[in-house]
C-alpha cells in the first residue's frame, strides 16, 4: 500500500492458510517496505505474533453476518530492516529518470538501472527519496506502462546516438 510518506506491506492469511511460506514472505517484505502488517482470520489470531517480527502490525478479520469486523491486535512500527536501495529497485526506469530530474542529476542514459540507483542514493537524502518514491508509485499508470517504457527506450536510444 502506498502512503504519502511510506510504502507498507500487507500480507493476508486466511483461516485456510498455513505458515509454510510466511517466513520467506516476512523476509521479503522486510527488505522493501517501511512498515508491515499481517491480516489474519480468527484461527490465526492467537499464534500469528510468534511468526512475525515485533514491529509488524497484526489485524484480525472476523465475519460478522454479512460484513467483516477488523480488530487491531498490534499497531505496526517502523521497519528497522527496510533497504532504501531495494525500495528504489521497485521503480521502473522512467520513474527513476523522473527522480533524477527532480533532483537535478545527470541522466546516465547509457548506464544500468543499478548504477542509476547508486547515484541517486549518493545524491538524494533518504527522507526526500522516501517521499519521491511514494509519489512515483502514486502516479504509476499500469495501463500505459508498456507505452511509457517503449517511449523512454526510444528517447534514450535517440539521445545516446548524439553522444557519439
Feature locations, PLM:
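Conserved catalytic cores of phosphodiester-cleaving nucleases, focusing on short active-site segments
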Residues: 1-16
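Acidic, metal-dependent phosphodiester-chemistry machinery of nucleic-acid enzymes
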Residues: 130-164
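Catalytic cores of nucleic-acid endonucleases
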Residues: 17-62
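Positively charged, polar, low-complexity stretches
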Residues: 1, 59-64, 73, 152, ...
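Hydrophobic transmembrane alpha-helix bundles
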Residues: 19-31, 76-87, 142-156
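Hydrophobic residues embedded in beta-strands of well-ordered beta-sheets
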Residues: 7-8, 66-68
Amino acid at each position: 500500500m502506498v502512503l504519502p510518506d511510506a510504502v507498507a506491506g500487507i500480507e493476508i492469511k486466511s483461516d485456510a492458510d498455513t505458515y509454510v511460506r510466511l517466513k520467506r514472505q516476512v523476509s521479503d517484505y522486510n527488505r522493501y517496505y517501511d512498515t508491515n502488517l499481517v491480516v489474519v482470520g480468527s484461527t490465526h489470531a492467537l499464534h500469528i505474533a510468534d511468526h512475525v517480527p515485533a514491529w509488524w502490525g497484526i489485524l484480525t478479520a472476523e465475519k460478522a453476518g454479512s460484513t467483516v469486523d477488523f480488530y487491531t491486535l498490534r499497531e505496526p512500527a517502523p521497519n528497522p530492516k527496510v533497504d532504501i536501495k531495494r525500495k528504489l529497485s521497485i521503480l521502473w526506469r522512467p520513474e527513476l529518470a523522473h527522480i533524477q530530474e527532480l533532483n537535478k542529476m545527470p541522466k546516465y542514459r547509457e548506464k544500468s538501472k543499478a548504477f542509476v540507483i547508486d547515484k541517486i542514493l549518493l545524491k538524494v537524502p533518504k527522507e526526500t527519496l522516501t517521499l519521491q518514491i511514494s509519489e512515483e508509485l502514486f502516479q504509476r499508470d499500469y495501463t500505459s506502462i508498456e507505452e511509457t517504457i517503449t517511449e523512454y527506450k526510444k528517447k534514450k536510444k535517440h539521445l545516446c546516438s548524439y553522444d557519439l
